């Protein structure tokens, strides 16, 4: 039996601005920058919960350049829940990630405004669900967010 040594470049990472083989996206850390849950009509409001609350969600994405190819991406979720036309809860979350990027300059903003939020969204959604449940409220699962449409709307001024 003979052994053959085969080499393949299929698994190499793309070479970016640094000229070295590096991952295109590297999430260094994720963190909760700000988290607030208010239940303004507690404890009386708990008697009113007989069905799922009406929930309004506002989502914002932003980023700042740190140094070299490092960026801080923020995903802000503001939620208001109402039951029987009364405020059940107000939840505000700013979930952030520090990332290193090795992408061409023309792809930088879409990666920061679409891909990174898409990667960290499941973690932010988990924080929201846990916060609501630990706050004595019914669990609420946020549907996936279309960050591409959000980005395009922002670019066109909608």
Describe the residue ranges of each PLM region.
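N-terminal intrinsically disordered, cationic/polar leader segments
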Residues: 2-119, 123-158
């Amino acid at each position: 039996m003979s052994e053959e040594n085969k080499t393949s470049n299929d698994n190499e990472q793309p070479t970016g601005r640094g000229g070295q083989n590096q991952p295109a996206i590297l999430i260094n850390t994720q963190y909760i920058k700000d988290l607030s849950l208010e239940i303004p009509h507690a404890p009386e409001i708990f008697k009113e919960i007989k069905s799922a609350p009406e929930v309004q969600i506002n989502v914002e994405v932003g980023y700042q350049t740190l140094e070299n190819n490092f960026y801080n991406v923020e995903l802000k979720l503001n939620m208001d829940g109402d039951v029987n036309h009364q405020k059940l809860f107000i939840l505000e979350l700013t979930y952030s990630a520090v990332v290193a990027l090795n992408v061409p300059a023309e792809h930088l903003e879409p990666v920061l405004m679409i891909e990174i939020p898409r990667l960290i969204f499941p973690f932010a959604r988990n924080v929201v669900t846990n916060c609501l449940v630990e706050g004595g409220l019914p669990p609420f699962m946020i549907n996936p967010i279309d960050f591409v449409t959000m980005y395009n709307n922002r670019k066109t001024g909608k």
